[in-house]
Swiss-Prot record:
Expressed by the venom gland. This is U4-theraphotoxin-Hhn1a. Residues 1-22 form the signal peptide. Monomer. It is found in: Secreted.
Length: 85
């Protein structure tokens, strides 16, 4: 009877440790996935900077100043370029 009780307690302890380890592994994998959008956002920021620069250059050649309203979403016009605020 004591052996059965000890075996059940050991199995329960192993199950708890295994579940805790699995939760930690899942949390780590989610943290790694969170970093991915940052690289995607960096690419979008670079693309946006390029688009705004080209837009301002086209307007500049057409004897117009860079329009501040063209720069939106955390961007502002500075030195005839849209820059991230």
């Amino acid at each position: 009877m004591k052996v059965t009780l000890i075996a059940i307690l050991i199995c329960a302890a192993v199950l708890v440790l295994h579940t805790t380890a699995a939760e930690e592994l899942e949390a780590e994998s989610q943290l790694m996935e969170v970093g991915m959008p940052d690289t995607e956002l960096a690419a979008v920021d670079e693309e946006r900077l390029f688009e705004c620069s080209v837009s301002c250059e086209i307007e500049k050649e057409g004897n117009k100043d860079c329009k501040k309203k063209k720069c939106k979403g955390g961007w502002k016009c500075k030195f005839n370029m849209c820059v991230k605020v």
